[in-house]
Amino acid sequence: MTTIVSVRRGNQVVIAGDGQVSLGNTVMKGNAKKVRRLYNNKVLAGFAGGTADAFTLFERFESKLEIHQGNLTRAAVELAKDWRTDRMLRKLEALLAVADETASFIITGNGDVVQPENDLIAIGSGGPFAQAAASALLDNTELSAEEIAEKALTIAGNICVFTNHNHTVEKIDY
């Protein structure tokens, strides 16, 4: 799996992820880019789960963003509807974390669209570790969203064998 973390603080939102691709217990690649900018660089998205599945979902999500003129909430809900009802999409195993300057969501294969309550998302095998670290840093430091995301990923990578220290970080300042 992997670890993807999204942190929102002040006028900044960040999605960051590690670069490890595993097949069973074997590391296949260490520098994968699991975080991307979409819709004219106005939306951030990261994935955890099957790589091929995630690319399919990125394409579908970007298409929904285009159709709904960058409206993140509407695009997320419409992708989740498709994911839940389309026979091919239902077989895809991945989670998406998406964010823009106004909102952040987790989109699941069950058709759920979840908005976090503390401006924090963490998904993937190292997600619980990253979430705990980021939550503590949000509550007890003045670090930026980017610094918190980096530190949370580093902590997750120290604990989770399916997460490495090769990070991709994308941010939007607004």
Curated annotation (Swiss-Prot):
SUPFAM superfamilies: N-terminal nucleophile aminohydrolases (Ntn hydrolases). Pfam families: Proteasome. It comes from the Bacteria. Protease subunit of a proteasome-like degradation complex believed to be a general protein degrading machinery. GO terms for molecular function: metal ion binding; threonine-type endopeptidase activity. HAMAP family: HslV (MF_00248). A double ring-shaped homohexamer of HslV is capped on each side by a ring-shaped HslU homohexamer. The assembly of the HslU/HslV complex is dependent on binding of ATP. Belongs to the peptidase T1B family. HslV subfamily. Coiled coil: none annotated. Gene3D superfamilies: Glutamine Phosphoribosylpyrophosphate, subunit 1, domain 1. The keyword Hydrolase applies. GO terms for cellular component: HslUV protease complex; proteasome core complex. Its EC number is 3.4.25.2. It is found in: Cytoplasm. It catalyses: ATP-dependent cleavage of peptide bonds with broad specificity. InterPro entries: ATP-dep_Prtase_HsIV_su, Ntn_hydrolases_N, Proteasome_sua/b, Proteasome_suB-type. This is ATP-dependent protease subunit HslV.
